[in-house]
């Protein structure tokens, strides 16, 4: 059913409702009252427009408790957390607005997981496009081990398009949130480059990995023999945000190394650590790793 047919159906239903009401009424409709029926019919036309996006509303500034004892104190408390605090109830049920927002945020999280990073973005950023041995998103989700491995073809693409034994190798992976990459990568990469330039450091070609798990950076480290590998990857989305990105950084990563050798900077998004601020901090961490020749817990202990 198209939009025109839907409008005609609604108009017909409303017209029948008006006719039924007139039949039940015992009052005689006079000539002066006839325009009322015309008026009702005219208002049945559906207006064109866009429904506001409820996900754009800042939950920290939204007051849903109509009879709050101290509204100002409630808003002050909500300002410190994006959690759903003071959502209000209608009897034993959530308010309609709270329920719709919950469903919208859940849908956004699902979209972030099951969608792919735009190929146009990969081309625009001049990334070296590669993929792990996963053949589909379903396989990526059900076989995490496949998201850590590259076939010979993609290994060769990485080998030919990166600088051997570079000080820094940057990697971007879709991870569990393509939305996180699309929302943050254009800001965080220039910030990292600018921060590194202050230490007379830089990086060359950036590798993009489709169907990427964090340990994929270990294989890239072995292929390139880079001193430091930094992976920017989409975090598992939740109801607070679907655009959160993390940076996993390691000194001389190798396949099968302990997770404790990674340094992680998480919660990179507009509602957490801003991308520009995170970029500057990532550059600082990379410089420390190159100086100390350590990462993860070892770097922490060496500071």
Curated annotation (Swiss-Prot):
<dbReference type="GO" id="GO:0031419">
    <property type="term" value="F:cobalamin binding"/>
</dbReference>
<feature type="binding site">
    <location>
        <position position="214"/>
    </location>
    <ligand>
        <name>adenosylcob(III)alamin</name>
    </ligand>
</feature>
<keyword id="KW-0456">Lyase</keyword>
<keyword id="KW-0170">Cobalt</keyword>
<dbReference type="InterPro" id="IPR042251">
    <property type="entry name" value="EutC_C"/>
</dbReference>
<protein>
    <recommendedName>
        <fullName>Ethanolamine ammonia-lyase small subunit</fullName>
        <ecNumber>4.3.1.7</ecNumber>
    </recommendedName>
</protein>
<comment type="pathway">
    <text>Amine and polyamine degradation; ethanolamine degradation.</text>
</comment>
<comment type="subunit">
    <text>The basic unit is a heterodimer which dimerizes to form tetramers. The heterotetramers trimerize; 6 large subunits form a core ring with 6 small subunits projecting outwards.</text>
</comment>
<dbReference type="GO" id="GO:0046336">
    <property type="term" value="P:ethanolamine catabolic process"/>
</dbReference>
<feature type="binding site">
    <location>
        <position position="235"/>
    </location>
    <ligand>
        <name>adenosylcob(III)alamin</name>
    </ligand>
</feature>
<dbReference type="GO" id="GO:0006520">
    <property type="term" value="P:amino acid metabolic process"/>
</dbReference>
<dbReference type="GO" id="GO:0031471">
    <property type="term" value="C:ethanolamine degradation polyhedral organelle"/>
</dbReference>
<comment type="function">
    <text>Catalyzes the deamination of various vicinal amino-alcohols to oxo compounds. Allows this organism to utilize ethanolamine as the sole source of nitrogen and carbon in the presence of external vitamin B12.</text>
</comment>
<keyword id="KW-1283">Bacterial microcompartment</keyword>
<comment type="similarity">
    <text>Belongs to the EutC family.</text>
</comment>
<keyword id="KW-0846">Cobalamin</keyword>
<dbReference type="InterPro" id="IPR042255">
    <property type="entry name" value="EutC_N"/>
</dbReference>
<dbReference type="InterPro" id="IPR009246">
    <property type="entry name" value="EutC"/>
</dbReference>
<dbReference type="GO" id="GO:0009350">
    <property type="term" value="C:ethanolamine ammonia-lyase complex"/>
</dbReference>
<dbReference type="GO" id="GO:0008851">
    <property type="term" value="F:ethanolamine ammonia-lyase activity"/>
</dbReference>
<dbReference type="Pfam" id="PF05985">
    <property type="entry name" value="EutC"/>
</dbReference>
């Amino acid at each position: 059913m198209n939009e025109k047919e839907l409008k005609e159906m609604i108009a017909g239903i409303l017209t029948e409702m008006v006719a039924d009401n007139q039949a039940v009424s015992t009052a005689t409709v006079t000539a002066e009252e006839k325009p009322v029926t015309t008026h009702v019919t005219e208002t049945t036309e559906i207006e064109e427009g866009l429904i506001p996006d409820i996900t754009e509303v800042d939950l920290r500034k939204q007051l849903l408790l109509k009879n709050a004892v101290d509204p100002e104190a409630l808003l002050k408390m909500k300002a410190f957390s994006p959690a759903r605090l003071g959502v209000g109830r209608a009897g034993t049920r959530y308010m309609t607005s709270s329920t719709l927002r919950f469903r919208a945020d859940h849908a956004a999280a699902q979209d972030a997981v099951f969608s792919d990073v735009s190929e146009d973005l990969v081309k625009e950023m001049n990334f070296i496009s590669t993929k792990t041995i996963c053949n589909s998103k379903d396989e990526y989700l059900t076989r995490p081990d496949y998201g850590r491995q590259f076939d010979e073809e993609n290994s060769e693409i990485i080998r030919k398009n990166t600088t051997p034994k570079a000080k820094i190798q940057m990697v971007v992976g879709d991870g569990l949130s393509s939305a996180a990459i699309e929302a943050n990568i254009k800001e965080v990469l220039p910030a990292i480059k600018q921060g590194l330039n202050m230490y007379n450091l830089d990086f060359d070609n950036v590798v993009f990995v489709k169907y990427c798990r964090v340990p994929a950076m270990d294989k890239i480290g072995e292929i390139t023999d880079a001193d430091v590998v930094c992976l920017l990857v989409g975090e598992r989305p939740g109801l607070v945000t679907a655009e959160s990105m993390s940076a996993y950084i390691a000194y001389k990563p190798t396949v099968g190394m302990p997770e404790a050798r990674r340094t992680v900077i998480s919660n990179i998004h507009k509602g957490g650590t801003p991308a520009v601020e995170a970029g500057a901090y990532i550059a600082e961490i990379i410089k420390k790793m190159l100086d100390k020749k350590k990462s993860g817990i070892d770097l922490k202990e060496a500071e």
